[in-house]
Amino acid sequence: MNQAILQLSEIEKAFPGVKALDKASLNVYPGRVMALMGENGAGKSTLMKVLTGIYSRDAGEIVYQGQPAQFKGPRDSQQAGISIIHQELNLIRELTIAENIFLGREITSAFGRIDWPQMYAEADKLLARLKVKHSSKTLLGQLSLGEQQMVEIAKALSFESKVIIMDEPTDALTDTETEALFSVIRELREQGCGIVYISHRLKEIFEICDDITVLRDGKFIGQCEVVQTDEDGLIEMMVGRKLEEQYPRIDVVHGQTCLEVIGLTGSGVHDVSFTLKRGEILGISGLMGAGRTELMKVIYGALPSERGVINLDNRTINPVSPQDGLANGIAYISEDRKGDGLVLGLSVKENMSLCALDKLSKGVQIQHQDEVVAVDDFIQLFNIKTPSREQIIGNLSGGNQQKVAIAKGLMTKPKVLILDEPTRGVDVGAKKEIYQLINKFKAEGMSIILVSSEMPEVLGMSDRILVMHEGRITGEFEAKHADQEKLMACAVGKKVSEEAA
């Protein structure tokens, strides 16, 4: 193995009430892809922020290209040849793709004016390299979340970096977009670029990475080549224990029908009908753009419906806003927790109780003691890792933020809980905790809709599964009669009956 192009040795970083990094180490080698693994809260993101100068380090050493390094901020590290593609998009929807890629370093002519033809041409080359079928003159806001992620990757590629850090880069990508990204990673590897690949998708780690570094509780646990381990061994390194069963589904006797949707049409949804019983988990599967999220938002009131009927507990409802949906007993946990679900500048307590203030008030007065008790109960129940309920939620790991988002929905005491990609960007340990919580609500008789792009998750946790394609239901199965092949056939528009299956 070559000499490391980047070495982080025994890095330490503490925040009030928590030691985020405790002698964490990472080596990055030219022409190799290093997976950085660990549960949420293990210190992966903090280590990357120390590297790029967002946080100062308390102790430890960074060596880059054989020289000690201490970057003053992301721009400094970027100019030195280290780019980071963040899990959360750092783009401006109102600008074009090209303007986003070259923001702050626009290509100019000899007279100091922006050379638009040259800038668009360079941006188009980057998009073609990633197989993005859009002109760089397109406004970013017109792109899907997955396409926007590819623009973020194109932006990093434009720096011709020697080290590229990818934090959950495929989280919002389709299979086609993921394969295009992997092609680019292989190309960069051949060119001698060192890549840090942060992902919770173990299948991707074994497909694209050469080496693995594992952190746990801010500590360096170990480094090995991918060929020296397997999924079980890697999980045990990450969580410090064996995960006996990935999807701990429980059997519950279903009650009466709680939710009935008949001929629902609107906002990318066409003539959808289904029922949901008490104590049932209904999985919704399909490819990106199939209309799953749109269907949930129409039911919840976040998108308008054109026609159709929604019955909740034998009463017809017509939610015209999210507040209306909540008032009727429907809670929706968004796939975009930072865009739709949480206010990052507020505390854990404020976020959790935000939608339930009417239930925590008497008249116009909020009962703060009741609020504190309810929030503390959820922090304990959900095992949310936070120094206190007053901690700003933006400082928490992704998995703990997701737990707060789910608790926020449950604070409203809903009849129907809609979970849209509840484990996206969440490590295997936190996933298991979320699955156990879902089972707890199911056992208590709550009606749950689980929307997920991960077919094993839908198959493993659901009682019944609907598959969508182009806004329509193309398949319905009892989970015990379904498999990935049947779900995929329906997801691409092929009608598959359960009997034929």
Curated annotation (Swiss-Prot):
Tell me the membrane topology, using the record's own terms: Peripheral membrane protein
Q: Key word Transport present in the record? A: yes
Recorded GO MF terms: ABC-type D-ribose transporter activity; ATP binding; ATP hydrolysis activity
**SMART domains with a match to the protein in the record:** AAA
SUPFAM superfamilies, alphabetically?
P-loop containing nucleoside triphosphate hydrolases
Q: Which Gene3D superfamilies match?
A: P-loop containing nucleotide triphosphate hydrolases
Q: Which UniProt keywords apply?
A: ATP-binding, Cell inner membrane, Cell membrane, Membrane, Nucleotide-binding, Repeat, Sugar transport, Translocase, Transport
Pfam families cross-referenced by the UniProt entry: ABC_tran
- Its primary localisation, in coarse terms, equals membrane
The residues listed in the UniProt record as binding ATP, with positions renumbered to this chain, are 38-45
Q: From what superkingdom does this record's organism come?
A: Bacteria
Which compartments does it reside in? Answer: Cell inner membrane
Q: Where is the ABC transporter domain?
A: 6-242, 253-495
How this chain assembles, per its entry, is: The complex is composed of an ATP-binding protein (RbsA), two transmembrane proteins (RbsC) and a solute-binding protein (RbsB).
Could you tell me what this protein does?
A: Part of the ABC transporter complex RbsABC involved in ribose import. Responsible for energy coupling to the transport system.
State the name under which the record lists this protein.
Ribose import ATP-binding protein RbsA
At the highest ranks, the source species' classification is: Bacteria, Pseudomonadati, Pseudomonadota, Gammaproteobacteria, Vibrionales
Gene field = rbsA
